Amino acid sequence: MLSIVVLLLLMAEGSSQNYTGNPVICMGHHAVANGTMVKTLTDDQVEVVTAQELVESQNLPELCPSPLRLVDGQTCDIVNGALGSPGCDHLNGAEWDVFIERPSAVDTCYPFDVPDYQSLRSILANNGKFEFIAEEFQWSTVKQNGKSGACKRANINDFFNRLNWLVKSDGNAYPLQNLTKINNGDYARLYIWGVHHPSTDTEQTNLYKNNPGRVTVSTKTSQTSVVPNIGSRPLVRGQSGRISFYWTIVEPGDLIVFNTIGNLIAPRGHYKLNNQKKSTILNTAVPIGSCVSRCHTDKGSLSRTKPFQNISRIAIGDCPKYVKQGSLKLATGMRNIPEKASRGLFGAIAGFIENGWQGLIDGWYGFRHQNAEGTGTAADLKSTQAAIDQINGKLNRLIEKTNEKYHQIEKEFEQVEGRIQDLEKYVEDTKIDLWSYNAEFLVALENQHTIDVADSEMNKLFERVRRQLRENAEDKGNGCFEIFHKCDNNCIESIRNGTYDHDIYRDEAINNRFQIQGVKLTQGYKDIILWISFSISCFLLVALLLAFILWACQNGNIRCQICI
């Protein structure tokens, strides 16, 4: 059996070197055994030679501190950092692009609430820096620097270090306080102040003498007036009283007035606001590492090599857009038509209409030929480069279309009614649905264009060769031409590079074409004549047989008897 196989291989090899038919040249395109399926405008499953995944599905398990500056709040959230709670001293003067709030952050001072918490949190985060400017406040006939056992610093009773707790004087006096601060600077000031709510009337009079107290804070355009809400509450860090913190922004040229007869938690200064800063905040437990990335999510940092991601809808920085799809593939190669097995011992060749060529690795398009000198394959770099020039940069163009700074944070509503929260969620979901649809459509459109461009360049190559050969060759209908004149490898090369001279071979090609067509016609008539001759012979044999039977019956040599 082995000897038979060897013999067949030798015959096939020998045949390629002793080819006696007309030269044949075929146009073809690159193919691979297993391509990649992509979606186009007209088909959900089109196999292409190569494709690139556009949806990022992997992230780093850490946050990258470069090039964006990250500040880790550790046990402090951003509001406690601004108030100056114990344990937040590491945030003094901190500056950030992204403030990292930890889910494990806790309050470490007197129990408090902020009626407009999210707005204050957003202002502080966007400011990008804790730049506190201390000021002198002249409070008369009151005791300052109140402390609490709920707010210990180094095991000593203390308080928020950015605020001043005012209580009655040792002489049991808390006269009306009326203090004005004018903003003569060129930046807006953020003042944070508070109102203490004692748990009992006794506590109220012990601390402030006056019952009820009152705090009013005004600017030229706003006024906030608060009367303490006295009442018993659950103990938190040993305290049933509470503090409500408020904030006021004073623009340049404006002023702020503090008016109180008790219960004021006064500021010790203000925070400088920077309207040009575009910083933000991220709540996550992911640790900060030593990597480099411009995009952060609550799951970790991402690279920006792909235009889309489906890791998290919470994304900060220069990030891929979040989409619902787990995969979107961009075609970066032509339609894939895997090559068929060689047919017969003589390795019949076929062009692009029947299949692609897996051996064509130097280009997308190329030639195969068969002539008296053998067979060969060569890439056509001109058509390949023309297609690549149009297709290259698709990924960059796609990224440019989605390259705007993308900052999407899930809102945290604490004290707004559920209908607003539901509306916000609906808007965010609708935005994501829209982006997901746009992404899928955009990729399908680009894929359709890629395949159309690739097919167009293949057709251009075929037409270029056809115009060169003209009547010197015949289109075989499968992407190949049968050439009607002798065409050695130099001749084949001239067809490939576009220098083929049709006139040189014209007379030879016409003569050979007529001879070949005449042989074909003669062979056709021969078949017809054979069939006619066979039919006449059969007819004559039957006629002779009938004549013999009639003659024999007349002479009595054969008697026919018919019975009914």
UniProtKB/Swiss-Prot annotation:
Palmitoylated. Gene3D superfamilies: 3.90.20.10, 3.90.209.20. Pfam families: Hemagglutinin. A lipid is attached at C553, C560, C563 (S-palmitoyl cysteine). It is found in: Virion membrane; Host apical cell membrane. The record marks R343, G344 as: Cleavage. Residues 17-527 are extracellular. HAMAP family: INFV_HEMA (MF_04072). Belongs to the influenza viruses hemagglutinin family. This is Hemagglutinin.
